[in-house]
Amino acid sequence: MASSTAGLRPRRKKNPLSFIYSPKVIRPAVAIAVLLVVWQILCSGEGSNLPSPVQVLEQTYPLILNPFFDNGGTDKGLGIQIFASLTRVAVGFSAAAVVGIALGILIGSSKFMYDALDPIFQVLRTIPPLAWLPIALAALQEAEPSAIFVIFITAIWPIVINTTVGAQQVPQDYRNVSRVLKLSKSQYFFNILFPAAVPYIFTGLRIGIGLSWLAIVAAEMLIGGVGIGFFIWDAYNSSLISEIIIALIYVGIVGLLLDRFIAFLESLVVPAEQK
């Protein structure tokens, strides 16, 4: 009798570089390369008002190589500028997450609260974030807390609305079981309501963090000081278009990383079958 192991083949070792050659890497890389080539062609001719990729790299490589220089005042590297903006976003978004989740669960759990507050929230959420900035400056009298308030008011609405929807998705059978078992309010919240709402909460958080990053860049252009938004505006006033472009690239990368960070937290908290 032939050995039962005769047909077995040794397992192939995974190439640690295989990810680099995967479609998820190659396709975006090709798209970026095509974009750069088109950009280079369009902006290399005479009369172009925008720099080409090569010119951007030549004019901004000191900023890229030394992102944390500090010459005092607002003359700081891109790393410091982005960190200042991220700090404001972290404070405003964290406050919006706490308040928004609490409000959303309260409204989604009570028909009375939903009927009373939903029309008000639907009106307030349509107000552009920057429209709140003059009100915040008038009330708080300082630029820093005003910028944080703009972040808060920007992020809170998607969090409230999505959490409310999630709290309303608890199946009626679950509610009936909780009554039969005479679960306490805390038991009902932690075992039934919150798990049902978690996927919706993270949807609101992902939308909120993206809007927060958009809003702080715009708000900093108006309030001044250290921050990536004011850096872009100051570069425009100085006709440093290459610096604007490299800053926009950094803004986009940070926005992507923020979204991926919330998605990573979601993968740790939300069971796969609920996604």
UniProtKB/Swiss-Prot annotation:
Residue span, ABC transmembrane type-1 domain: 82-262
Name of the gene encoding the protein in the UniProt record: nrtB
GO BP annotations, alphabetical order: monoatomic ion transport; nitrate assimilation
Name listed for the protein in its UniProt record: Nitrate import permease protein NrtB
Subcellular location: Cell inner membrane
Membrane spanning residue stretches: 25-45, 89-109, 120-140, 147-167, 189-209, 213-233, 238-258
Matching SUPFAM superfamilies: MetI-like
Keyword match Transport: yes
Entry-linked Pfam families: BPD_transp_1
Record PROSITE patterns: ABC_TM1
Segment forming the signal sequence: none
Topological category with respect to the lipid bilayer: Multi-pass membrane protein
Family: Belongs to the binding-protein-dependent transport system permease family. CysTW subfamily.
Source organism phylogeny: Bacteria, Bacillati, Cyanobacteriota, Cyanophyceae, Synechococcales
Primary role: Part of the ABC transporter complex NrtABCD involved in nitrate uptake. The complex is probably also involved in nitrite transport. Probably responsible for the translocation of the substrate across the membrane.
Quaternary data: The complex is composed of two ATP-binding proteins (NrtC and NrtD), two transmembrane proteins (NrtB) and a solute-binding protein (NrtA).
Main subcellular location: membrane
Gene Ontology MF terms in the entry: nitrate transmembrane transporter activity
Organism of derivation: Synechocystis sp. (strain ATCC 27184 / PCC 6803 / Kazusa)
A single Gene Ontology CC term: plasma membrane
Keywords tagged on the record: Cell inner membrane, Cell membrane, Ion transport, Membrane, Nitrate assimilation, Transmembrane, Transmembrane helix, Transport
